[in-house]
Amino acid sequence: MNFQPVDRLPVWEWAMWWDKTIARWHGEGLPRELKFGQVFEIAQYFGLDPYQQFWFSTTQATIEATQHHTEGMVGSMDDYLSIRPKLYPDHSQAIAGMRPWAARQAQGEAVVWVTLEGFFWFPRTLMDFERLSYAYYDEPELVHRINQDLLDFNLRLLEQIAKSCVPTFMTIAEDMSYNNGPMISQPTFEEFLAPYYRKLIARAKELNLLTIVDTDGEVTMLVPWLQAVGVDGVLPLERQAGVDGNQLRRLHPNLRMVGHYNKLVMHQGEAAIRAEFERLRPLMKSGGFIPSVDHQTPPGVSLEEYRLYVRILKEYMVTAAH
């Protein structure tokens, strides 16, 4: 990801497989002891490069906690202040659990990455998208209060994390794009997100963390906004949303990218799988890019089709690196 020569590119799936995909594969020969959510173990089974993700929830002191129970609960400052004591949990136990992975990462056995929740994602979770859209105009002080609290929480997390295991990279969960571009305007981004991003990214860079924003949809318009606040890259670059990674590389030579392999060709046979990798070959050769399914392998892909995809993926990770 640093645009340096490599022997091969990582053989990596950044997003876990759908639960329905795993259920289908159990009927096609995937060992039943490999359950949905066992990302590390399933990656090992397929011979993918191992990684361990730690998602630090704003609502529960568990990894990969769901947030749906808070969706839309906040409509005013009073609402927020009433639930605030239940937010921003203590993640000390989860962070202590990172220490064994620090050793594995140091020995080259795994890559550790952390996910923090972003300054569009979290207010939207609390308020829902429609309320948040109005709040930018009607209750700006509420949005700023939420994002200041979130910034303080995320900075505390980084300080704690650094004492247990400095990850290779950090993703920021946002999902603030759709198939026609960003869900908010650039002035809204500059007022309500950029000040908090700059402070968070500055600390991440002090820890030598690569920073990648996770946002679905069409990101072309959003990328320069993110780069202006110091973000290094984006994922997953969904092809069906119209993203063109080769164009992004021409526009932004230093942008790091992950994903962009069109998941909808994976069930179409070897020729289609290879054609999609050929589309990505210039991007792979440019550096700073790791190809991966652009958002979870869907249940329409059989176990054998996925094995074929992985075999060809491994091939291209070598040939495209030279």
Each model region followed by its residue ranges:
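Active-site loop segments of alpha/beta catalytic cores
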Residues: M1-G37, D49-Y51, H69-T70, G75, ...
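Glycine-rich, N-terminal phosphate-binding loop and its surrounding beta-alpha-beta segment
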Residues: I42-A65
